[in-house]
Amino acid sequence: MHLPGYLKKQADESVHEYIFFVCLISLALFLPGSRFMQSFTQIILFVSWIADGNFRQKCIMLGQNRQAVFLMLVFPVFVAGMFWTYNALDRLWLSLVDKVPFLTLPLMAATIKPPNKARLHFILWVFVFSVSSTAATGLLLHTIRPEMELRELSPFISHLRYGIMLVMAIFLIIWLTHSSKASHKSKIFSYFVSGVLSVFMLLTGWLTALVSFVSVIGFLLLREAFRKHNTSARRALAGMAMVLSAGLAVWGLVVTARPVFYEPPLPHVQGNELTREGNAYWHDFQNLRRENGNPVYWFIAEDELREAWNQRSTFCFDGKDFRGIENLKSTIFRYMASRGLRKDREGLDALQDYELRAIENGVPNYLHLQWPQFLIRIHQSFWEIQEYRRTGDPEGFSLAQRIELWRAAWKAFSEKPLLGWGTGGVHTAVNFGLDSMESRWEMRDLKPHNQYLLYLITIGTIGFATVAVLIFMFITKSGAYRHLPFMLMMVILLSAMAGEDLLDFQEPTTFFLLFAVIFGILYEKSPIKEKGELS
């Protein structure tokens, strides 16, 4: 197999410089796939850096790349947080280990001869390939096991963390082909792959990825609308696209929210005590759960419905659905309520066979058969919020649980606003908040699922502001903001961190630092490509 020249070790290149390049490829390759390989790669990087020696020269190089120091100083902030941690063993080790790359990756990138731009672009291509391959693997597994949940379409890491990489790859592949002056066919192919990945993302309905995707679209349109070098026509077109996009977003929110918050007068019970077969209805008047405005637990003739269901379905009325999830019965009640049907034989007879198959697959509302997955996910989020408002219990609802944790985290932050509860004190802080709220949720030892709140409760306002200033100084001093991929990565992270504490995990931290190192340290001082190399 013939490798392009820029992938081979160059004559004027040391072994350690080549190892650095290969390890960056490895990081990009394993970002969406293997936490172990990310750790192993970074260990090899550090061992090679130590073995290279020349520490005096490296100190000089670090002094010439002061932007790297700003990133490196993030780590000592969290080390300092150890000194006021309530429980020194409460995630302290994991909290620090996952932040070590803040210290090591910028240090190594600043003190070594950088790869040329052809190599840096190749690293980014490897990232796109890895993300695309992971999506293909997820789809293949779904064809083998159709009962798998949509979150399992990310087979190797959490869908929350893979989702941000997926959004990045969607836009990065287009930037790479345009920046490399690729052929017209290559550009068409890049748009095709980007489109396929976009469809995959929309079909998954992953809320964090959807929010990041919409945020990037908004950022790009704003950028075009206010870019000085653009023509008036182009800026006007971007403005029109912004208005259209905002209109579509509002339409999607209205369409999915209306059935959830629509509450018509409750149906009359008197005079409707019996089914057509003469069986008495049962009503849970204390349970006002609704589907499309209709009460779920009113007008139930359970024995009659059980008999009718078991005659038409191979799934037991009191058993599990196709996905193996308990309580198929509640899904039947919800679906029939969404259609405005009473829960009896007559109501079940009104359902088509395809609707029974949908119920067996866990579909709780007939509207979910008409909508694409991303609208379904938005509708589910509204429904969770409504149920949380109605009962005050977040159990079983992912978004409601996040809201409960955000409230608890804010309560904990209000108790210790300046320095927080310490680097390892996140569980202690959140438990305090949940107990103070007298939360009905029994789960404890959780994180707030919000990066901003996580920093506020662990290192306080002072630590949070310090980290924010250090990252801002890195961005401005390094000139990373001039590179579109870096800015897209920041938009993705900043939006996604509202719903997940991403930088408390290795994969998103490495994702952030890889792009920060490439565009904030290596790209500007990278040698100009040699003749025949990729851009």
Model regions and ranges:
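Long extracytoplasmic/lumenal interhelical loops at the membrane interface
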Residues: 319-343, 379, 385-415, 419-459
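Interfacial transmembrane-helix termini
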Residues: 26-45, 58-65, 76-102, 112-122, ...
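Loop-to-helix entry and N-terminal half of a specific, functionally important transmembrane alpha helix
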Residues: 19-27, 69, 193-194, 446-450, ...
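Membrane-interfacial loop-to-transmembrane alpha-helix junctions, especially the N-terminal start
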Residues: 15-21, 59-74, 119-127, 186-190, ...
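Alpha-helical transmembrane segments of multi-pass inner-membrane proteins
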Residues: 3, 8, 79-83, 104, ...
